Structure formats: structure tokens, C-alpha cells
A protein has these predicted regions:
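Short, Lys/Arg-enriched N-terminal segments with co-localized hydrophobic residues
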Residues: 1-15
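Positively charged n-region of N-terminal signal peptides that target proteins for export
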Residues: 15-19, 33-34
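Sec-dependent N-terminal signal peptides
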Residues: 19-29
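C-terminal, surface-exposed recognition/capping segments
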Residues: 39-49, 161-162, 169-234
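Structural motif
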Residues: 88-90, 164, 191
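GIY-YIG nuclease signature motif recognition
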Residues: 93, 166-167
Length: 234
């Protein structure tokens, strides 16, 4: 028995030791190989959103899957509705009407942009002008509080993001055409939504219901209370 134990220690333990060392080396090599995989390179085995979460560049994604494949995807707090094919900038939007209909704000004369991408600048401009005493301007009056669409959006912190704004009329139309028309997004067809586009005393608004001027912005009234679409770009 002692002799058998001797042979067990001499012959079996070194074999087990070698097996263990071999497995350890293999594990290290495998781990190193995994560490060398660049997750920021487009991986066709992953979804587009998974690639986005891995910080794959937008331009690489466009080259791999095409620009339109990104429309309607939920990412970055909203649904992608515009992609800049030169810079890779994304614009996303979502419904924020859970708070109910909200006012436009003070009544005053102002012109703001209508093209895609104008929303952030226009939202800030509207908030700045609301800070003035608009009871003194021709045809103007004071709303009387900060509980109005553009201030709400600019101050909002939602899903870890604090750079929200009200999109322009052109952006609302792009949201309708690139997202809502394909059954994506969370936009309410029963609501009229504010845009950040204004022509003089007339703010532009839009329905998402095809039977009621759906997808086409039109002049509304600052006296109304409407729903909110909020957007961000990054």
C-alpha cells in the first residue's frame, strides 16, 4: 500500500499539475484574445442598437447597414429620426405628454427657424424672450409662470439626459415621416404637438393623425395648451 501511494504521488500528481498548468495557459490566451476584440468595430452578429451601445461610429453603421436602417430605433432616450451622414450626428425624439397639455408661454412677436436642427437654438431663444416683460410689447402679454412648454423641456432631466428641447416644425415632420409612419415611436395621434417654430405671433404645431393634417405643420395659437414632443441631438 505504501508503495502504491508512492507511485501515485510520483506519477499522478505531476500529470495533474501539468494538466492544470496547460488549462491555465489556455485560459490566459483565450482571455487575451477576447481583450483584443475591438467592440467599436461593427459586428454584423449584433443588432444595430447593440452596436450603438458599443460605441460603433455612426458613419461605420451607415456604411454597413444604410442610413434608413437607423430610423425609428430607440436609442439615447428617444427614437432616431434624423442622421447626419457627414458628421454622424443623431437626433432622437419622444412623446412627453404624460404631464398633460401645456401652454406656449408669453405672447410676443418672434421668428424662429423651421429646419431640422433649429430646435435647440429656438427653444433657448423662446425661453430667453419669455424672461422679458412682454406685457410692455405691442400685442404682448405675460403668461405668468415657468410652467410652459419650452422652459419645461430646457430644464428637463429624463433617463439620464438633460439636453432636451422642443423640435422645429421641420423636425416634427421628419419624426412623422421617418418614425411614426412606420409604426415606431410613442407619439399620440389624438394630440396637437408644439414645435419651436414661430412666425411672428403664430407658433407652428402638428398632428400625428394622418386624417387631421398629419405630418404637416401649420400655424396655431399661443393661447392653446398642447402636447410635447421633446428631442435631443448628439
Amino acid at each position: 500500500k505504501i508503495k502504491n501511494l508512492y507511485f501515485c504521488f510520483i506519477y499522478q500528481f505531476p500529470i495533474m499539475k501539468n494538466i492544470f498548468l496547460s488549462m491555465l495557459v489556455l485560459a490566459i490566451i483565450t482571455s487575451c484574445s477576447k481583450d483584443q476584440v475591438d467592440l467599436t468595430v461593427f459586428n454584423p452578429e449584433l443588432t444595430i442598437v447593440e452596436n450603438l451601445n458599443n460605441d460603433v461610429s455612426i458613419l461605420d453603421l451607415i456604411e454597413a447597414v444604410g442610413l434608413e436602417a437607423l430610423y425609428g430605433l430607440e436609442f439615447g432616450g428617444g427614437f432616431i429620426f434624423n442622421v447626419n451622414s457627414t458628421s454622424g450626428e443623431l437626433m432622437v425624439a419622444r412623446d412627453y405628454s404624460i404631464i398633460g397639455g401645456v401652454a406656449w408661454g408669453d405672447h410676443f412677436d418672434l421668428n424662429t427657424g423651421s429646419t431640422i436642427g433649429d430646435g435647440l437654438e429656438s427653444t433657448q431663444l423662446i425661453v430667453d424672450r419669455n424672461a422679458d416683460d412682454n406685457s410692455l410689447v405691442l400685442g404682448g402679454f405675460e403668461f405668468g409662470s415657468d410652467n410652459y412648454a419650452f422652459k419645461i423641456a430646457l430644464d428637463l432631466e429624463l433617463d439620464g439626459f438633460d439636453d432636451w428641447f422642443i423640435p422645429s416644425s421641420g423636425s416634427l415632420e421628419a419624426i412623422y415621416n421617418n418614425v411614426h409612419m412606420y409604426g415606431e415611436g410613442d407619439f399620440d395621434e389624438s394630440l396637437i404637438y408644439w414645435s419651436s417654430t414661430k412666425d411672428g405671433y403664430f407658433p407652428y404645431v402638428m398632428f400625428f393623425n394622418f386624417e387631421s393634417w398629419g405630418g404637416q405643420a401649420f400655424a396655431g395659437s399661443c393661447l392653446d395648451a398642447n402636447g410635447l414632443v421633446i428631442a435631443r441631438k448628439f
